[in-house]
């Protein structure tokens, strides 16, 4: 486990392995940043491991560095762990950015079952379609989720990815 993709619409990155700490005004959150669906991160220490600083992580917390260099801690249920080969394959695919909040549906029509609701900034893999599918699914884009399921989003909700997710890898 060296890499992961955020597998929830908005994942929380904490500055410490615990979610709260004692502050001047009592208990305060250790939230530092967030990772959006489909964004990549490097896993520095696996859940339950010992960090290079000698800190024992809880069994459900991973130490990560985001693709833009933010260091923190994430609950493992918010991540899809991938091998290095899988990460590079993912980054080489036709990635698209969610330009506005949108639903991922099971079918290319509003009657599809909602599989997930994504926020602006999430990343999806656009899937190739035949000419017949493009015509039949007009206005919809076929996408692949981090867990391997296929879904559909309105194509007007998608934008090209304008950044590289390999900054710290």
Where are these regions (language model features)?
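Boundary regions of SH3-family modules and the immediately adjacent low-complexity/disordered segments
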Residues: 1-30, 36-96, 100-103, 107-114, ...
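A short glycine-leucine-enriched loop at secondary-structure breakpoints
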Residues: 117
